[in-house]
């Protein structure tokens, strides 16, 4: 943690100029006070290494202070504000199940806030606070361009180690009449408009079996919803290539590394590569 603070102070002092960022693409990340240092560094490394020049917006989990926001402004990053919150809540106030879960489960912001606040953008990117864009990253911008150019909804996820949903992927496929749900992780993806439909999210959350499944594995609820949305017949859903995969132990030669809980202690190693 001491090393992370050293990197944090270095990036805070040197800052980052994001004034020429494209408005057509927005990169979102979600964190609060607890993950602030890591999230701050990940936002810097995205801007330095991803090959994508765009606005970076932190979805505030409600714990970021004015000091945190000032620090983020030093690297050209903005945070969601009260007006954004009102806009988001207005978008779901007629969707009772979505609204209820949004109030109870912070990771629903990865679905709802992204959909509402990316209105008018050609492409959006999402990365968790523990996703690190490495210096070896050289092809990610290609997938951003593909999403921009594709006619119709398209999304790329990084591949998870195994299917990780509120129940088995086979049960989900049967319940929602889907085929071949991808082994995806919703902590890192890039897509164009049209993937998320709030009315369909409400329909999923209204399903009695889905409600029962979430009682046992609620922490992957938003990931499961993304998997269902991305498996609709009108969505072109793909996995990013192997050098973006979530791997345990982490492969330090990958273009990005997703330092999930089991390997988060190795995050500092990625900064030294």
Features from the language model and the residues they span:
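Membrane-proximal basic amphipathic "stem/tether" segments
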Residues: 1-23, 265-273
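Catalytic core and acceptor-binding pocket of nucleotide-sugar-dependent glycosyltransferases
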Residues: 176-264
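Conserved donor-nucleotide/metal-binding helix-loop-beta segment in metal-dependent transferases, i.e.
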Residues: 133-167
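Short internal beta-strands
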Residues: 55-62, 156-157
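Short, acidic, metal-binding catalytic loop of nucleotide-sugar glycosyltransferases
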Residues: 45-53
């Amino acid at each position: 943690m001491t090393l992370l603070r050293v990197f944090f102070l270095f990036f805070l002092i040197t800052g980052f100029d994001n004034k020429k960022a494209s408005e057509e693409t927005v990169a979102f990340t979600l964190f609060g006070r607890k993950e602030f240092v890591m999230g701050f560094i990940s936002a810097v490394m995205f801007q330095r290494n991803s090959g994508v020049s765009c606005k970076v917006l932190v979805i505030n989990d409600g714990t970021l202070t004015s000091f945190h926001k000032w620090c983020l402004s030093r690297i050209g990053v903005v945070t969601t504000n009260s007006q954004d919150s009102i806009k988001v809540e207005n978008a779901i106030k007629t969707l009772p199940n979505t609204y209820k879960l949004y109030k109870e489960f912070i990771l629903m912001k990865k679905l709802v806030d992204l959909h509402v606040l990316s209105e008018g953008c050609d492409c959006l990117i999402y990365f968790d606070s523990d996703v690190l864009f490495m210096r070896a990253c050289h092809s990610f911008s290609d997938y951003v361009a593909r999403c921009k150019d594709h006619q119709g909804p398209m999304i790329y996820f990084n591949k998870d180690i195994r299917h990780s949903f509120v129940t088995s992927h086979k049960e989900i496929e049967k319940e929602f009449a889907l085929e071949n749900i991808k082994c995806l992780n919703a902590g890192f993806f890039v897509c164009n408009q049209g993937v998320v439909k709030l009315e369909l999210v409400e329909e999923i959350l209204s399903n009695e079996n889905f409600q029962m499944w979430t009682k046992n594995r609620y922490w992957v609820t938003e990931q499961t919803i993304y998997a269902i949305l991305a498996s609709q017949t009108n969505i072109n859903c793909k996995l990013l290539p192997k050098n973006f995969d979530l791997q345990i132990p982490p492969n330090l030669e990958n273009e990005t590394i997703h330092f999930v809980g089991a390997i988060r202690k190795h995050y500092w190693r990625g900064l030294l590569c």
